[in-house]
């Protein structure tokens, strides 16, 4: 069964100062998720699912329908905002918000990250390798997953024999920090069979029992890490073989645009993606 690509596009963008999911970074107003979808369609994915917020529905729908929405079926799911909170419940809960649109294997990606064609291709091969492929993540070398300037948070992954053993959130990481050259991190590019949703729902209910605060989130790396710690050889780690770039802060715009300009000049992407 061809896999779905689930794109998480419900973030608030407080640090960025706007809707970074729709920040134009390429020719013709293309945004980062356009390049992820382009790579996905070349890698065997046959449907896109977007998790968004109600208040951004019109803007995102307009962008999608004028671009990749003309090439592939797109489903929309909504991550609702509780009245007691100022931000969504996090990336794991966002996946659960889309469960009705996921009827088979699927990949998860952020709307505001560029993963590189080799990473998307690796995930496509994994998900199409078996009717029940299991779970996987794409691991990036830390050095390939940091912005040019500034400090960020990264999910460091401990890998043994190609399997994820643990995942730990690190804060304040920058290019000035000392870290082992082989350190791998997750940039939230995951692949799952549909049974994963059952485990995720169970974890969500446990999370709620802990009476989370107004700023607490049910994050996908934490949810997957808890399951992987209890079940050895659960999550395969695939090598990215590409460099990440993304929109964490406004200072990242020029690096992202420069990266995409180089890739277009090398013939990796057409100048006009959807024409």
Give the positions of each predicted feature.
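Residues at the starts of beta-strands that form the adenosine-phosphate
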Residues: 4, 46-48, 73, 105, ...
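Short beta-strand-to-loop acidic/aromatic patch adjacent to the donor-nucleotide binding site
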Residues: 104-114
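A short, conserved beta-strand element in the Rossmann-like catalytic core
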Residues: 13, 114-116
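Conserved core of the sugar-phosphate nucleotidyltransferase
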Residues: 116-190, 194
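Phosphate- and divalent-cation-binding pockets in alpha/beta enzyme and binding domains
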Residues: 42, 59-60, 118, 199, ...
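Short phosphate-binding loop-to-helix
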Residues: 68-105
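N-terminal glycine-rich phosphate-binding loop and ensuing alpha1 helix
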Residues: 1-64, 83
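Left-handed beta-helix
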Residues: 1-2, 133, 160-163, 172-275
């Amino acid at each position: 069964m061809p896999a779905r690509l689930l794109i998480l596009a419900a973030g608030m963008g407080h640090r960025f100062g706007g809707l970074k999911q729709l920040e134009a970074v390429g020719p013709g107003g293309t945004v980062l998720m356009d390049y992820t979808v382009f790579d996905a369609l070349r890698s065997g994915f046959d449907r896109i699912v977007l998790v968004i917020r109600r208040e951004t529905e019109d803007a995102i729908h307009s962008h999608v329908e004028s671009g990749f929405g003309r090439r592939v079926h797109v489903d929309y799911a909504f991550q609702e905002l509780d009245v007691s909170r100022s931000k969504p419940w996090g990336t794991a809960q966002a996946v659960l918000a889309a469960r009705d649109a996921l009827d088979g294997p699927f990949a998860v990606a952020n709307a505001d990250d560029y993963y590189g064609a080799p990473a998307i291709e690796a995930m496509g091969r994994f998900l199409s390798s078996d009717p029940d492929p299991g779970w996987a993540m794409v691991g990036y070398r830390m050095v390939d997953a940091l912005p040019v300037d500034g400090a960020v948070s990264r999910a460091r992954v401990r890998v043994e024999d190609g399997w994820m053993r643990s995942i730990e959130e690190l804060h304040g990481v920058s290019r000035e920090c000392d870290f082992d050259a082989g350190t791998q991190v997750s940039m939230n590019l995951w692949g799952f069979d549909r049974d994963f949703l059952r485990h995720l729902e169970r974890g969500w209910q446990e999370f709620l029992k802990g009476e989370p605060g107004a700023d607490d989130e049910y994050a996908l790396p934490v949810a997957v890490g808890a399951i992987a710690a209890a079940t050895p050889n659960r999550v395969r780690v695939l090598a990215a073989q590409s460099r990440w770039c993304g929109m964490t802060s406004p200072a990242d715009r020029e690096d992202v645009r420069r990266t995409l300009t180089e890739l277009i000049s090398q013939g990796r992407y057409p100048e006009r993606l959807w024409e």
